[in-house]
A protein has these predicted regions:
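C-terminal-of-GTPase-core extension/linker across diverse P-loop GTPases
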Residues: 2-9, 145-265, 282-284, 300, ...
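Switch I (G2) and immediately adjacent beta-strands of P-loop GTPase domains
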Residues: 53-65, 69-73, 254-282, 300
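Conserved beta-strand segments of alpha/beta enzyme cores
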Residues: 108, 270-272, 359
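A glycine-rich (often HGG/GG-containing) alpha/beta subdomain
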Residues: 1-146, 150, 154, 327, ...
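Glycine-rich, N-terminal phosphate-binding loop of Rossmann-like dinucleotide-binding domains
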Residues: 23, 90, 241, 276, ...
């Protein structure tokens, strides 16, 4: 248990109501020094857990605010420690004044993520659940919210615990075999049964590893590259999709040189739009670097919006098809015929030599015509599965790397069983697999890794 008591503001600035959280062995006593219940002959320490007490915060004889204080006793609190939460008016002055009074009476300011770190250290959650708290706070779509809730409620942890139990059973059979190797008549499990067990474990770990492809896209946004020649309307479309003037719009060719990225939620899915430099022949060194980055971002995209100026569509398609189509293999490509308001009887057909999965749409980004239709096409093109809170999908790079290491270890186990190698080597690989799975839950994680994880939380 930690021996000091911490405090921090737990709510965002600017609201009508603010909350200060206090946690540690002296949380109730320190709060009592500055808080007087409205009810006479009553102390905060006499309150039952999970109750609210109305009263006033005092600085000496001066009333700072009328507040509500909730009380939690260890181990039945978020951190597993004695805790109080002071709900006051949201004035920045009041919040800072209450913090100063708490610190004056024995608290210290909490470090970023320290409340959740204490919850982890006190066994209230494992490390993967603690990381899910940060993901929940940062969630910006229904899908990211559901995945964070699933992980925070222990869905991922239960999957890992089941795998560890199976691996421990596995290694116990191997080591029993080693302990009684002098008694050839004893057989605890034949190699075919062990192979089947290893195969079952490998399938589960491989499924979790493969789920990262979807999880990473859901968490960070479906990458959508907006490409095309200069002045095709790429920046205008980006501004319309983001509903803000993010990119500079100009009639001058080559205005966009730096890559501009931003995310927006469309239909419960986060899309990460990338406005790129217009592709053209140029002698400008800086513009050439921007075009080079355009192709790099194109390679990273899941969906490609090829902006085509409808007033000169055929020439642009002929000019860029050879450069773009090979790079768009395996991606969702949408031909966006822009500036439809300037052309009569526009042709938005897909050329015969284009792949079958290419889609097309006619719109006017400047006049915001047919933008909703494009948004529907983006949702369909994302090909994301429907996410529920029961789904176990990996979204964290640290988890992905640990699972990859575990998968490599179980592959060595399978190879060892197939080649009938000594149980000593097989047992070692099984234990390595267990180690990597335990690393995800924080059972073997070192202090430097913990510090790196929790320092990315907000204070409070």
């Amino acid at each position: 248990m930690n021996q000091d008591t911490i405090c921090a503001i737990a709510t965002a600035q600017g609201g009508a109501i603010g909350c200060i959280r206090v946690s540690g062995p002296e949380a109730i006593e320190i709060t009592s020094y500055i808080f007087t219940p409205a009810a006479t002959n009553r102390e905060l320490g006499d309150s039952k857990p999970y109750t609210l007490t109305f009263g006033r915060i005092y600085d000496g004889s001066e009333v700072i605010d009328e507040v509500l204080v909730s009380l939690f006793r260890a181990p039945h609190s978020y951190t597993g420690e004695n805790s109080t939460e002071i709900t006051c008016h949201g004035s920045a002055y009041i919040l800072q004044k209450v913090l100063q009074l708490l610190i004056k009476n024995g608290c210290r300011m909490a470090a970023p993520g320290e409340y959740t770190q204490r919850a982890f250290l006190n066994g209230k959650m494992d490390l993967s659940q603690a990381e899910a708290v940060a993901d929940l706070i940062a969630s910006s779509s229904a899908a990211t919210h559901r995945l964070a809730m699933s992980q925070m409620r222990g869905g991922f942890s239960k999957e890992l615990a089941t795998l560890r139990d199976q691996l421990l059973h596995f290694t116990s059979l191997i080591e029993l075999e080693l302990d009684f190797s002098d008694h050839e008549e004893l057989e605890f499990a034949d190699r075919s049964e062990l192979c089947q067990l290893a195969n079952n474990i490998e399938k589960v770990i491989a499924r979790l590893v493969n789920s990262f492809n979807v999880g990473n896209v859901i968490k960070n946004g479906v990458p959508v590259a907006i490409i095309g020649e200069t002045n095709a309307g790429k920046s205008t479309l980006l501004n319309v999709l983001l509903n803000e003037d993010k990119a500079i719009v100009s009639d001058i060719h080559g205005t966009t040189r730096d890559i501009i990225e931003d995310t927006v939620n469309i239909g419960g899915i986060t899309f990460r739009f990338i406005d790129t430099a217009g592709i053209r022949e140029t002698s400008d060194t800086i513009e050439s670097l921007g075009i080079e980055r355009t192709f790099q971002k194109l390679d990273q995209a899941e969906i490609v919006l090829w902006m085509i100026d409808a007033t000169n569509a055929q020439a642009q398609i002929t000019q860029l098809a050879g450069q773009l189509l090979p790079r768009c293999e395996g991606k969702q490509l949408i031909l966006v015929y822009n500036k439809a308001d300037l052309v009569d009887n526009i042709q938005n057909s897909i050329p015969d030599n284009f792949p079958d999965n290419v889609q097309s749409i006619t719109l006017s980004a400047k006049k915001r015509e047919h933008i909703e239709e494009l948004q529907r096409m983006l949702i369909t093109s994302a090909h994301l599965p429907t996410i529920t809170q029961n789904d176990v999908i990996v979204t964290n790079v640290r988890h992905y790397e640990a699972l990859n290491n575990a998968l490599e270890a179980i592959h060595r186990v399978q190879e060892g069983l197939t080649n009938n190698i000594s149980g000593d080597f097989i047992s070692q690989d099984i234990r390595e697999c267990i180690f990597h799975l335990s690393d995800i839950a924080g059972e073997v994680t070192n202090d430097m890794v913990l510090q790196n994880i929790f320092q990315h939380f907000c204070i409070g």
